[in-house]
Amino acid sequence: MVSSTANTSEQQILEWVELNPKLDLPIAGTIIRAKDVEILRHWIVPGLFEGLTFPDVEITLQETQKFPPDQSFVLATDRHAGEAQIGEDGSLKNYSAGQPFSHEQIKAAEPTVAGIMVGWNQNHRWQHFGLDARDIDLIYLGSKQNDAPINTKLGLLGQGSIDRLITFDYRRVYLNNLSMLAGREYRVEIEDAETLFFKEFYEFTSPHNVAGTRFLVERKLDQHADDQVNIYSPTERRVRRYSARERADPVMGSNFTLDDVEAFSGR
């Protein structure tokens, strides 16, 4: 987990969005090392870029690839092209399904608005009904410089150290804006679909001091509403609402708040 993202301000991000680099990216196959990494600054968002500035960094640039979405997503994008709009508050208006904004719309927009369009496109990319992943490792890297490799099983082949390793199961289910459900108003036919965009579940399985901790996150269709978060704590043996104060605190011993983890929401 890269702590530099926690020290990056909104203003730095906005200034980066407004940059218009005159240089072309290096060609595919180029190997970027510490002495060259500065040439990537204009192309990598602040916070992430600083996480790449270490002595042994080695980045091999690859050819861009295409990962075509499901045909239903393509059809929904074409059917509703030009309908979605960005509100004065950055909210997404008049959106049904498919990709909200075309590349042409993004290129023609003022930089800040273009960035918001990209955010909404990311949220509403093709994701089927969601994601179900088991045994995900959260690796908290430390400041000690132990000999390489840190942990071959985890794919950490460089120097450094692990401060903490947490394992969890994760599920997210989308209830609305589903392009493959065109005949059902793009929504799942359950009661929660009246108010929710998605439901998300985390269950931490190790180490023992966090095992059994569970988060249930509900993102509402109302873009101005906060995510509703309920947490089950095995030490308290009860379910409770995640408070506003807790939302502003680092989650599970990381440098990130829960809102950081949940990413762009338009608020």
Regions found by a protein language model. Give the residues of each.
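Solvent-exposed N-terminal domain segments of exported/luminal and surface proteins
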Residues: 1-226
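Acidic, serine/threonine- and glycine-rich low-complexity intrinsically disordered segments
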Residues: 200, 213-267
